[in-house]
Amino acid sequence: MLIPWQDLSPETLENLIESFVLREGTDYGEHERTLEQKVADVKRQLQCGEAVLVWSELHETVNIMPRSQFRE
């Protein structure tokens, strides 16, 4: 089930994004990015619709994924 990111408080959204970024592991790119930069990138992706917040009833968890990978 999709969760509209706009319905979350700014603090809750920030915490969800930080948790997601920290779970994603190490960035092996040419330049290391700060947590703040990664959080800003994910927030931008949510705002422009490239990424979505998804609630899993089975696992009772929230995840962030590319919109193209989401299937209802």
Swiss-Prot record:
Gene3D superfamilies: YehU-like. It holds the Pfam family UPF0270. It comes from the Bacteria. HAMAP family: UPF0270. Belongs to the UPF0270 family. This is UPF0270 protein YheU. It comes from Escherichia coli O139:H28 (strain E24377A / ETEC).
